[in-house]
């Protein structure tokens, strides 16, 4: 099997990139792509850049040219769930846009035209991530992750997310675009993010301070889940 992994920022992919064996590197449309093996698993790791457009472009490149069997989105996120702390893991059950508004045409807030309201992560992948997180003794929450082209640091933007998506556990800037592309390619996906801040007025300071911690945590989860993923995938195919 082949696993696709996508992260927005250099800090979010560096730890995994450093461990790829027989690594081949190329650049396409501003995306850095690294292919090789993590342990015995064939992987393609892509750094897309920040935001929904960059994420959608990178995901399309990854799925079209490398054709991974599944896709994992890694990186950092801002926590919305009250019990989440820096370094805790959030796992997507579903992903939605928080900044899309075509409600004038009868769609839900956050629903892109001609798309479902939410994009649902693969249940088997969620189970594998939960097993891995438990083995690593990390605190994790699974639930709705919201995405939009804004860094959330309190005020009206945060209030709007809490109003329309009261069950959201985290917010970030790429996952929904990645999920939409996976939906259109019919590729199973899961989002694994570690908390770097809590979306308040000081979130930009927290993000800068704790980004590397969040990146390390999410990368560790992915690295440890790959053997379980390979074994499980082989057993069901």
Swiss-Prot record:
Keywords: Amino-acid biosynthesis, Hydrolase, Methionine biosynthesis
Active-site residues per Swiss-Prot or TrEMBL entry: 12, 197
Reaction catalysed by this enzyme: S-adenosyl-L-homocysteine + H2O = S-(5-deoxy-D-ribos-5-yl)-L-homocysteine + adenine; S-methyl-5'-thioadenosine + H2O = 5-(methylsulfanyl)-D-ribose + adenine; 5'-deoxyadenosine + H2O = 5-deoxy-D-ribose + adenine
GO molecular-function term, one example from the UniProt record: methylthioadenosine nucleosidase activity
Pathway(s) it belongs to: Amino-acid biosynthesis; L-methionine biosynthesis via salvage pathway; S-methyl-5-thio-alpha-D-ribose 1-phosphate from S-methyl-5'-thioadenosine (hydrolase route): step 1/2
Protein's GO biological process: L-methionine salvage from methylthioadenosine; L-methionine salvage from S-adenosylmethionine; purine deoxyribonucleoside catabolic process
Chain sites annotated for binding substrate: 78, 152, 173-174
SUPFAM superfamilies attached to this UniProt entry: Purine and uridine phosphorylases (SSF53167)
GO cellular component terms given for this protein: cytosol
Function: Catalyzes the irreversible cleavage of the glycosidic bond in both 5'-methylthioadenosine (MTA) and S-adenosylhomocysteine (SAH/AdoHcy) to adenine and the corresponding thioribose, 5'-methylthioribose and S-ribosylhomocysteine, respectively. Also cleaves 5'-deoxyadenosine, a toxic by-product of radical S-adenosylmethionine (SAM) enzymes, into 5-deoxyribose and adenine. Thus, is required for in vivo function of the radical SAM enzymes biotin synthase and lipoic acid synthase, that are inhibited by 5'-deoxyadenosine accumulation.
Protein name: 5'-methylthioadenosine/S-adenosylhomocysteine nucleosidase
Designated gene of the protein: mtnN
């Amino acid at each position: 099997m082949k696993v696709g992994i996508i992260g927005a920022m250099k800090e979010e992919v560096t730890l995994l990139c450093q461990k790829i064996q027989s690594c081949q590197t190329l650049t396409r449309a501003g995306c850095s792509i690294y292919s090789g093996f993590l342990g015995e698993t064939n992987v393609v790791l892509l750094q897309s850049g920040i935001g929904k457009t960059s994420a959608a472009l990178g995901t399309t490149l990854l799925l079209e040219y490398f054709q991974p069997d599944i896709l994992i989105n890694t990186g950092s996120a801002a926590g919305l769930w009250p019990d989440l702390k820096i370094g805790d893991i959030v796992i997507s059950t579903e992903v939605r846009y928080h900044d899309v508004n075509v409600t004038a045409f009868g769609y839900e807030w956050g629903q892109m035209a001609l798309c479902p309201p939410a994009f649902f992560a693969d249940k088997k992948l969620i189970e594998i991530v939960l097993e891995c997180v438990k083995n690593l003794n990390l605190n994790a929450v699974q639930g709705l992750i919201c995405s939009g082209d804004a860094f959330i640091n309190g005020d009206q933007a945060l209030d709007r997310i809490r109003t329309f998506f009261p069950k959201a556990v985290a917010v970030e800037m790429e996952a929904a675009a990645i999920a939409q592309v996976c939906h259109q390619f019919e590729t199973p996906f899961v989002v694994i993010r570690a908390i770097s801040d809590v979306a308040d007025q000081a979130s930009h300071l927290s993000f800068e301070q704790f980004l590397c911690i969040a990146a390390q945590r999410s990368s560790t989860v992915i690295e440890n889940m790959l053997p379980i993923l390979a074994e499980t995938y082989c057993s069901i195919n």
